[in-house]
Structures are given as C-alpha cells and as structure tokens.
Amino acid sequence: MNHETSLALAANEGEERKHEHWPMMSFTFPSRLYTIADTLGRPELSFLDLTQKICAGGARLLQLRVKELPTREFLPIAHEVRAICRQTGCVLIINDRADIALAVDAEGVHVGQEDLPLEAARKVLGPDKLVGVSTHDPAQALAAERGGADYIGFGPLFGTSTKATGYNARGLDQLREIRALVRPPIVAIGGITTERAPAALAAGADAVAMISDVVLASDVTAKVREVLEKVKEA
C-alpha cells in the first residue's frame, strides 16, 4: 500500500470515527524519553549492565529487546532487569514476548506488525497491562487504536541502522498526520538523536525512542541525563 492510498483510507476512517464514542486514553508516558536496552553494537555490555547504566541516568521507561537468545536464557535476564527497574521506579516493557512480560510481571509488551497480534497479546496479558504497537503508516496507526493499543510506536522517523524495518524514513510531516488521526500516545522511533528529539516532540510525538545515541555513548548514564534535560526543554 502506497502512502497516498494509506492516507486516503486513514482519512475516511477518521471521518467515520467522529460519530463514534471513544473512551479517553488512560495511559501517559512517564517520561518523554523511551529507552531501549539492546546490546547489539556493545558486545562488552550485558543486558543487566546496560539496564543499570540507563536507569542510573534517571530513565523512567525502558523496553528490553532481546532477539537472539532462546527463552530459557531470556527469562532469567528479564527477571533481573525487572528487579533493577523496580528498584529505580522505571516502567518495563518487553519487546515482542508477551509470555516473558507475563512471567516477570513487566508493565507491558511492545509488538510489531510481524509479531504476536495486538488482540492475542492482550489476551495473554489481560486488561491491566500495557500493549504498545509499532506502526509505519496512517492505516496501521488507526488499526492499532481500534484494537485498543495503549500507545503507538511510529517510524522509522529518520533513517536508522539499528533495526531493519523494511520501511523508508517517514519524516516529520507524516508524524504530524498520524498525530492528527489517533488519540493514544505516540512514541517516535528510528534515527532519533539528542539533536533531533525536540523536532520529533514538536511534530506531535509524546515520547522519543532512542537506541544508538544512548547505547553507543561512551558514558551511557551521562547520555541518558543529557537527553532527559533536552526533552524536558522541548
């Protein structure tokens, strides 16, 4: 589906939605910085080391993204990350794995377009946990809202080398379009740096997800503090 077709479908759905009753969203991001613990590119750091450094910088929202480990190795890591997050008051979201999120009592799960469907993730976690959904165009964002997503991820906003999404950079204009169409909070992701974060927030994102700029920093804790100050001013 090209951008023009997607936008037209989204606009039609948006018009139809005006006549429906939509509940007020109940979730808000605890921070404008959405950190992601992914050790790709930092083989010398364990997930626990990285989590400790991120949380020490004052992060209040962290997604644990573990792609390369089998479940029996992932689970104990998730338990330990959960303990660090509880000690520091950081909300923990597990990437992709609703079963792991349930097992460690994380606050929620984040799923992509090729992962466990939103409805299935909700059945696994129940109504009291968060389910976030990655989207890449207006139609996907509206589908996530209709499905009851607590928040919507949108991107890649800019070019990114961290994760191969199969989608071209979406840009700030399309972020503005998404913001005008949906009510749930939006986290922008993809190529976002400390310098680009304010522009993403000004375009309608409620939070910005950062991986490379944080994880690859020589001092991860100091970088988190720097970004938190930057987004506070935006």
Predicted regions and their residues:
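Leucine-biased recognition of intrinsically disordered, low-complexity hydrophobic segments
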Residues: 7-9
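Short, electropositive alpha-helical surface patch
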Residues: 205-213
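Glycine-rich adenosine-cofactor-binding loop
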Residues: 171, 188-193
